[in-house]
Amino acid sequence: MAELATIARPYAEALFKASLSDLNGAAVWVEELETIAKNPQLLQFADNPNVTAAQVYELIAGIAQGALPAMAQNFLRTVIENGRLSALPEIAAQFRVMKNAQSGSSDAVVYSAFAIDSTALAELAATLEQRFARKLNVSVQLQPELIGGIRVVVGDEVLDSSVKARLEQMKMALTA
């Protein structure tokens, strides 16, 4: 993992510096490229020695939902030509960290057993921003195994109010 982070850092820094004028726009296409690059079949295709960098680029550009901006095209070509497609998710993660550091915000992942409607999510986001004393970029991921409640991860901080966590606490108390 440390090696992947070391490989990704110069790409993330260059991307951050090049996109300072439109960080939010860049974040959108970086996230899309990250999602595409996580596909194991795509990585297997890209690792095939009979496949050219141009073919990999055309495939990814075709998968992308919209036309990629010129900066995204150049960035993607560079990553593919240097054989670093597998590092793209880590590049995206480091880019997000730099973007958040500049804006003074953090990413928050809310794990929930059930879908959260937009009104409840907005209220939850406001409460979490007060609790963590900073602006949060909230995303939701469903985890039915939580049974009920939510688990929030902000950086290295975890706020777990799920039923599963409470059951685990009760189990620990009973077996202690």
Curated annotation (Swiss-Prot):
- Cell inner membrane in keyword set: yes
UniProt xrefs under Pfam families: OSCP
| Molecular function, one GO term | proton-transporting ATP synthase activity, rotational mechanism
Q: Which InterPro entries match?
A: ATP_synth_OSCP/delta_N_sf (IPR026015), ATPase_OSCP/dsu (IPR000711)
Record's subcellular location: Cell inner membrane
Keywords attached to this entry? ATP synthesis, Cell inner membrane, Cell membrane, CF(1), Hydrogen ion transport, Ion transport, Membrane, Transport
Q: What does this protein do?
A: F(1)F(0) ATP synthase produces ATP from ADP in the presence of a proton or sodium gradient. F-type ATPases consist of two structural domains, F(1) containing the extramembraneous catalytic core and F(0) containing the membrane proton channel, linked together by a central stalk and a peripheral stalk. During catalysis, ATP synthesis in the catalytic domain of F(1) is coupled via a rotary mechanism of the central stalk subunits to proton translocation. This protein is part of the stalk that links CF(0) to CF(1). It either transmits conformational changes from CF(0) to CF(1) or is implicated in proton conduction.
Q: How does it assemble?
A: F-type ATPases have 2 components, F(1) - the catalytic core - and F(0) - the membrane proton channel. F(1) has five subunits: alpha(3), beta(3), gamma(1), delta(1), epsilon(1). F(0) has three main subunits: a(1), b(2) and c(10-14). The alpha and beta chains form an alternating ring which encloses part of the gamma chain. F(1) is attached to F(0) by a central stalk formed by the gamma and epsilon chains, while a peripheral stalk is formed by the delta and b chains.
**What is this protein's record name?**
ATP synthase subunit delta
> Which organism's genome codes for this protein?
Albidiferax ferrireducens (strain ATCC BAA-621 / DSM 15236 / T118)
What gene is behind this protein? atpH
